[in-house]
Design a protein with these regions (language model features):
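Sec-dependent N-terminal signal peptides
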Residues: 4-13
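Residue-level detector of alpha-helical secondary structure
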Residues: 13, 42-49, 70, 80
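C-terminal motif of bacterial Sec signal peptides marking the signal peptidase cleavage site
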Residues: 15-17
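Peptidyl-prolyl cis-trans isomerase
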Residues: 19-38, 57-491
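Acidic/histidine-rich, surface-exposed loop or edge segments in extracytoplasmic proteins
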Residues: 28, 46-54
Length: 491
C-alpha cells in the first residue's frame, strides 16, 4: 500500500509529443461503459482507498462483483446525466475543481517521472540503512522562541539537568515526548542526527530552526530496535528501505529544481491590504476541532455545492480590486488571487496555529501557490496534460460527482429517502434497468477482473501538503447487485 501511494501515477514522457490525449493502454482497461472507461487501477483504488459499505466490504468474489457493478453503475449514472442540463455540473465551481484536480495530478506525474523514477539506489546503500530501519526512538523535546533561550537550555544540560527537569521548572506538567521511526518523514537534518550508530541515551540533538522561526531541541530518552526475523519480513523491509531512500533522493533533487525554477522570482506584499486579508482569512481557516471534523466529512463536494459558506472573500471589508501583492512586477488583485484559489486552494505548512501565527503562515501559503503556478506551467509546456492518466483522473472525479447529482435528482423525495437501505431499495431496480439499456455498450475484461485481489481493510487514503488531499471519491452507494449478467467480455 505504501508503494501505491508514493507512485501516484506512472507515465512516460516519451509519448508527450502527440497533440491529442493518449489512449488508455488496452491491457490496463477493466471495463468500457459507453464512452467511459474503468481502469484496473481505478477499480483497486476505489475499493481500497475509501471505505466500502458493509454489503461489499469483504474480500470474497461476491463482494468483488458488487464493487464492479457499483463502479459501472456510477458510469451509467454519469451517462444519464449527459441528458440533463444540470446547473451544478455546468457550474464554474465544478470546472475549477476539475481543473485543480487535473493540475495537481500533472505536478505529481512530473515529480514521479522526472525525479522519482530517475533515481537508482544501489544495494550497498540499502544495506547501510537496513538494520537502522527497524528503530523507533523516544525523544523529549522543547520548542523555544529564540536561540538565546536555547543557549540557556544547553548550558543547563551541561550541568546534567535533563529537559524534563528544565520543563518542570518553567512550566507545569511533563516535558513533551514523541516517538520517531526511521520511516517517518522528518526533515532530513533531524533524521540524519537521530538515526546514527553513535547515538547515546540522554544525548541532546539540535537545535533545529523551524519554518515558523522557532527552535526545536531534542533529548534522546531511548530506543527500540525491531529486527526483521523472517525471510518474508526481511524482503519487505529491504524493499521499503529502497523505496524510502529513493523518495528521499528524488525529493532532494526536486527541491533543487524548484529552487532553481523560482530563483529570481519576486513577490512583494501590499502590507495594509494583506493585513486586512489575513485577519479575515484567519476567521475562515482557523477552526476548532469540531469544525475541522465537519469540514473533513464534507470536504469533497462542498467546494462545488457550498462555495460561499463562511467565505471571507465576499466580506464587505475587502476591496476586491485592491492590490494584494505584486509578483515579478505584475499586479495581483484580491480578485485575481481568489480566482486562482478556486482551482488551487491554499495549503498551510503548519497544520495547527493560532491567529498570531496566521499572517506568517499565510505568506508561506501564498508563496506555495505561486510556486505551484510556475511548476504547472512547466507541466503544460512538457505536454503532461495530454497524458492519458491525467484525463482518466479528471473523468474519475467528473463521473463520481455526476453520479451523485443523478442520485440527488432522481430520488423522489430528498427528505423521504434517508437511510442507506431506502436509497438502495429505490436505486437497485433503476440500475438494473440501465444495465439492460446500455448492455451492448458495456465490455468487461473478465480475465483482469479475476486476477484482482481485494482486502477487507477499512481505509481512507489522503495525501499531505497538497490542495486536494483525498485520493479518490467516496465509494458509490447505488447498487447491491452481485450478478454480471449484462454486457460482453473483451477479447
Amino acid at each position: 500500500m505504501i508503494r501505491a501511494l508514493s507512485c501516484v501515477i506512472i507515465v512516460s514522457f516519451s509519448a508527450f509529443s502527440c497533440t491529442k490525449p493518449q489512449p488508455i493502454p488496452k491491457n490496463l482497461v477493466l471495463a468500457h461503459v459507453g464512452d467511459k472507461t474503468i481502469t484496473i487501477q481505478d477499480f483497486i483504488r476505489r475499493a481500497e482507498y475509501s471505505i466500502r459499505p458493509a454489503y461489499c466490504r469483504q474480500s470474497n468474489y461476491v463482494h468483488k462483483k458488487i464493487v464492479l457493478n457499483s463502479l459501472i453503475a456510477e458510469k451509467l449514472a454519469a451517462l444519464e446525466m449527459k441528458k440533463n442540463e444540470d446547473e451544478l455540473l455546468a457550474s464554474s465551481h465544478f470546472k475549477s475543481f476539475l481543473k485543480g484536480r487535473k493540475e495537481q495530478a500533472m505536478r505529481q506525474v512530473f515529480y514521479h517521472d522526472e525525479f522519482y523514477d530517475a533515481v537508482t539506489i544501489p544495494d550497498t546503500e540499502v544495506q547501510d540503512h537496513f538494520a537502522m530501519a527497524g528503530r523507533t526512538i523516544q525523544v523529549n523535546y522543547l520548542n523555544l522562541p529564540d536561540i538565546k533561550t536555547i543557549q540557556k537550555i544547553l548550558e543547563l544540560s551541561q550541568d546534567n539537568v535533563s529537559l524534563d527537569s528544565i520543563f518542570k521548572s518553567l512550566w507545569e506538567g511533563d516535558v513533551p515526548t514523541r516517538e520517531i521511526r526511521w520511516f517517518d518523514r522528518e526533515p532530513e537534518v533531524i533524521h540524519g542526527q537521530l538515526f546514527q550508530k553513535e547515538l547515546k541515551k540522554g544525548q541532546l540533538v539540535g537545535p533545529f530552526k523551524t519554518e515558523d522561526n522557532t527552535y526545536l531541541i531534542m533529548e534522546v530518552d531511548g530506543w527500540i530496535d525491531r529486527p526483521a526475523l523472517t525471510g518474508k519480513d526481511q524482503k519487505l523491509r529491504w524493499n521499503d528501505v529502497r523505496e524510502r531512500l529513493t523518495e528521499k533522493t528524488a525529493r532532494s533533487h526536486y527541491m533543487e529544481y524548484v529552487e532553481n525554477l523560482m530563483a529570481g522570482n519576486k513577490m512583494e506584499l501590499n502590507p495594509d491590504v494583506f493585513d486586512t486579508y489575513a485577519t479575515l482569512a484567519a476567521d475562515y481557516y482557523i477552526k476548532d476541532d469540531d469544525e475541522k471534523k465537519d469540514a473533513l466529512n464534507q470536504a469533497i463536494w462542498d467546494q462545488i455545492e457550498q462555495p460561499d459558506v463562511k467565505n471571507f472573500k465576499v466580506n464587505p471589508e475587502l476591496d476586491l480590486t485592491a492590490t494584494l501583492f505584486t509578483y515579478n512586477g505584475e499586479t495581483w488583485t484580491i480578485q485575481a488571487f481568489n480566482d486562482l484559489l478556486k482551482s488551487r486552494p491554499l495549503v498551510f505548512r503548519k497544520r495547527k496555529m493560532n491567529k498570531g501565527e496566521f499572517p506568517f503562515q499565510l505568506r508561506l501559503a501564498v508563496a506555495d501557490v505561486l510556486m505551484d503556478f510556475e511548476i504547472t506551467q512547466e507541466c503544460y509546456e512538457a505536454g503532461i496534460d495530454r497524458n492519458w492518466t491525467i484525463a482518466s483522473n479528471v473523468d474519475l472525479w467528473h463521473d463520481a460527482y455526476a453520479s451523485k447529482r443523478y442520485i440527488d435528482v432522481k430520488k423522489p423525495d430528498r427528505d423521504g429517502v434517508e437511510s442507506e437501505k431506502e436509497l438502495l431499495d429505490f436505486f437497485n431496480p433503476v440500475i438494473d434497468s440501465l444495465q439492460g439499456v446500455y448492455s451492448d455498450k458495456i465490455v468487461i475484461n473478465m480475465d483482469a477482473f479475476e486476477d484482482i485481489e481485494l482486502t477487507a481493510t477499512d481505509m481512507v487514503v489522503t495525501q499531505k501538503g497538497v490542495p486536494y488531499p483525498i485520493m479518490v471519491p467516496l465509494f458509490p452507494i447505488i447498487t447491491t447487485d452481485n450478478r454480471l449478467d449484462y454486457g460482453s467480455k473483451s477479447d
